């Protein structure tokens, strides 16, 4: 299929980290991998009547704000903000918050400040990896991967700089274990790993086929994790949906303390991915409650 390429000038940043520009015929373009004041060539990934979406293929005139992403091959799959300095990211996010209030005719009394604990990388406590198998060689490879933004393709990775290091370490251990047992990517759906604030991890391996002893109790005990599960997930659904819990090893319940209260939660459950920042938001909200129940 022939690629649809457009050249345009980018004007601003919108929510989520896309840059916004206008095509020659007047249609708006929401672009991944671009910055304001850049002229770029984009590959159109979605073409609607009033707008297009696309991914930067070539930067013709680069912004002074552009930096080399920490994860150059996969950053668009995890955090499109990596192509700018942390201070620039904070500036744009503050401006987007202010703009959101202005759309509702609300003028904030004070300048917006974005709170940070200074951790740019290694802070996320949950990552969901896909799987990728290269069948071009004599032996099929097995890699953890992310979906490529704007396509159905996948990007093999060694982890992500945003995740707690223990998550990346565990993901590679599980990959190597499955590879040593000749497990093929087509039989696997996803690998979900979550850790608490001490770095203790729980994993869930979602599979699409019946794989007896894909991970044995002894193998699970040798992984750098407090526990894990093997889960059959309906292959008709792309989501990591729990159809049947096949095996469970160790302790699969994570535990964290926030403002003196202990929370226990499952690997697959919804919980904040950056607990120190979430805890600060709780402090801020508590200040406005005036000791009310």
What does each of the following model-derived ranges do?
Residues 1-293:
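Accessory RNA-recognition modules of RNA-modification enzymes
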């Amino acid at each position: 299929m022939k690629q649809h390429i457009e050249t345009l000038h980018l004007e601003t940043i919108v929510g989520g980290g896309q840059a916004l520009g206008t095509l020659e015929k007047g249609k708006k373009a929401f672009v991944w991998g671009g910055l304001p004041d850049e002229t770029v060539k984009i590959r159109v990934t979605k073409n609607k009547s009033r707008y297009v979406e696309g991914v930067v293929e070539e930067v013709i005139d680069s912004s002074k704000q552009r930096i080399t992403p920490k994860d150059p091959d996969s950053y668009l799959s995890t955090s499109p903000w990596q192509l700018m300095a942390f201070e620039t990211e904070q500036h744009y996010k503050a401006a987007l918050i202010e703009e959101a209030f202005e759309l509702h005719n609300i003028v904030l009394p004070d300048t917006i400040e974005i709170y940070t604990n200074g951790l740019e990388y290694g802070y996320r406590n949950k990552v969901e990896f896909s799987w990728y198998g290269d069948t071009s060689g004599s032996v099929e490879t097995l890699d953890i991967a992310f979906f490529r933004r704007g396509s159905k393709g996948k990007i093999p990775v060694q982890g992500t700089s945003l995740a707690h290091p223990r998550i990346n370490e565990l993901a590679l251990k599980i990959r190597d274990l499955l590879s040593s047992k000749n497990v093929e990517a087509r039989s696997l759906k996803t690998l979900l790993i979550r850790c608490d604030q001490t770095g203790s991890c729980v994993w869930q391996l979602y599979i699409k086929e019946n794989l007896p002893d894909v991970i044995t109790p002894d193998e699970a005990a040798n992984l750098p994790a407090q526990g894990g599960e093997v889960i059959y997930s309906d292959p008709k659904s792309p989501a990591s949906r729990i159809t049947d819990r096949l095996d469970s090893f160790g302790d699969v319940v994570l535990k964290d303390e926030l403002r003196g209260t202990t929370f226990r939660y499952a690997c697959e459950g919804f919980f904040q991915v950056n607990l120190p920042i979430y805890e600060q938001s709780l402090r801020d909200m508590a200040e406005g409650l005036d000791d009310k129940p």
